[in-house]
């Protein structure tokens, strides 16, 4: 996932070398949950999951408890995301908007910050 101005775009690793030069930020992780509106995962193992998605000009950040990758992909799809990427889960999952809305379960060394 790369950020360009006020938008986000998803690239597969195979096409990262051809990504535009005006990228202002990026995130790489595994697995991809949605691509072009299609669900890419089938794992049913439950846990705390976090992800980031984009669709319809909107950026979505989701923390889901007791969810599988498939559950998380379906949540993003129901919100209108066409592309979504799993982020670190478990105790690393946190959502902050002035105060913590979810987590964290431990000190976190890095964060995705949306301004």
Can you say where each PLM-predicted feature lies in the sequence?
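Gly/Ser/Thr/Pro-rich low-complexity, intrinsically disordered segments
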Residues: 1-115
């Amino acid at each position: 996932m790369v950020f360009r101005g006020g938008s986000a775009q998803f690239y597969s690793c195979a096409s990262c070398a051809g990504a535009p030069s005006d990228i202002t930020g990026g995130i790489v992780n595994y697995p991809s949950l949605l691509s072009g509106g299609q669900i890419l995962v089938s794992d049913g193992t439950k846990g705390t999951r976090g992800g980031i998605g984009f669709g319809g000009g909107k950026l979505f950040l989701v923390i889901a408890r007791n969810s599988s990758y498939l559950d998380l992909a379906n949540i993003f799809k129901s919100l209108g995301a066409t592309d979504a990427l799993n982020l670190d889960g478990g105790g690393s999952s946190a959502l902050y908007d002035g105060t913590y809305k979810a987590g964290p379960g431990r000190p976190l060394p890095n964060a995705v910050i949306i301004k």
